[in-house]
């Protein structure tokens, strides 16, 4: 069996394989499709124009073009070129594509410039911070901060990440607005420091929300007003006393610092108003209070009179003889006014003290129902014997209480 030798190369001038048969037919078909109106071509007309005897070859070309997304079938024997549809002109798309590519190149150049400037700035900051001569001057004094914000209240807040800060819109009465700052943290405590504390201003108070139990039990410990000097009540006492020096408050030198602490899941509220200035309160407290002259004789307490009268009979007889020998009343006799003992004030029950607490803003319906069901508003206990048939009946029913006897506006508290 003889072996087949190598195939001889085709003679020059012979067309290659891609220039004949299906490749050449595809090139002619695409050219015919581009020349069609609106890109719509009839396959029967294309087969007659290209002198194709077998329409199967035309269908092979259309299937490939449809598979790669260049054409779409409008009907059974008509196709449309997608690049020549309404608003899809080939030349317009090419021009727009060129513009978009040029814009992308320009944006890339700008991005490179910004990256270069960023590197330069970071290197400059590193050179300044790492310099030995500049490291000893890298601080800001307390006076520099206060000088930059003269006339404003500065608060330094140190809180963990995730702390929310809210400044609600002020809603004041009679044109007075009160600004508040709400800080809330669930991950750690919050520290608030007052930076520009003046020596002549009143000490600020930072109250955590909700307030602690010791603050609720002793509200007077938060802010206690200074005691006022007691004025003289009689002219005779003024003449006998030397002139007392005027009392003026002395300010403690140095900057004060306020620190408010709040644990996890707690809030701190710092409030202030434009009309409430601590300087005004300091000026009012520094005004001298002169003695007031009153031409009155206050009476002595009845308890003191009873104790003095029952002390001894000899002292009373001697006082009677002295008073009878005198021609008139003794002008040096002074009587002290009746003063209420602050320790003997009637303490309200716990339920009533919560009602008249000025720090409470509003009362919920649940609290009202709890108070109405407590012993304070329970029906009165009948101490008198049951009335007879001829007695005047004006008693309360077992289901009635103090609110039914008197007009007590419980719901308006």
Curated annotation (Swiss-Prot):
A Pfam family this chain is assigned to: E2F_CC-MB
Region (Transactivation): 337-413
UniProt motif (HCFC1-binding-motif (HBM)) ranges: 389-392
Stretches the record annotates as Dimerization: 86-181
DNA-binding region(s) in UniProt: 16-85
Compartments, as annotated in UniProt: Nucleus
Tissue: Found in all tissue examined including heart, brain, placenta, lung, liver, skeletal muscle, kidney and pancreas.
Region (Interaction with RBL1 and RBL2): 390-407
Protein name (database record): Transcription factor E2F4
Recorded name of the encoding gene: E2F4
